[in-house]
Amino acid sequence: MRPSGIRKFFDLAAEMPHCISLGVGEPDFKTPWTIRDAGIRSLEQGRTRYTANAGIKELRAEICRYLARRMELNYQPSEVLVTVGGSEAIDLTIRALVKPGDEVIIPEPCFVCYEPITSLTGGVPVHIATKAEDDFRLRADQLRAAITPRTKLLILPYPNNPTGGVMDAADLEAIAEVLRGTDIMVLSDEIYAELTYGLDRHIS
């Protein structure tokens, strides 16, 4: 397994004075104090012990409220699993769904972890090159051409890292139409849902 090229650039940039690193996807501002204060309060209250495997129930309930408010999606806390980060969630999802020989469709450019995790499960990464003239959106005809009888999973990484591309409602409906009647699962990586620019707005 090759080391991450992005992490290599991150390490190099850290050693160069006055270098602005674009190597990892994180904001250029510090964590807001409302979040820091909540973390400090949690530590002061001794909330440092093991939780339920799925995560703290109150947190899962709050995630459900966020999804309803922001994405108009309705879930119950029993349907939510809290992980230590986005990469772990991606890893667990791919490991749960993909068996040796299964194909995983990955639009590119993309986050670096999709391919190695797929390979570790014995799955086969199938790359689709999105184009600048399409604003790096996955087109339905590209997806249709990539599907085979071995296709198990489509990764939808939008808003996209690193391009910032966003799929609109018509794009998503066209993708859904291609997948209707199949057993293909979708991993929707929406970690950058709140980081869109201009008039673009993320639709889950």
For each feature predicted by the language model, list its residue ranges:
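N-terminal small-domain helix-loop-helix segment of the aminotransferase-like
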Residues: 1-85, 92
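Helix C-cap/helix->beta junction micro-motif
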Residues: 16, 121, 181-182
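Short acidic capping loops at alpha-helix termini that bridge into adjacent secondary structure
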Residues: 74-80, 100-103, 150
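Conserved PLP-anchoring active-site segment centered on the Schiff-base-forming lysine
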Residues: 96-118
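A short helix-loop-beta submotif of the ANL/AMP-binding
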Residues: 120-126
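Active-site phosphate-binding strand-loop segment of PLP-dependent enzymes
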Residues: 126, 130-201
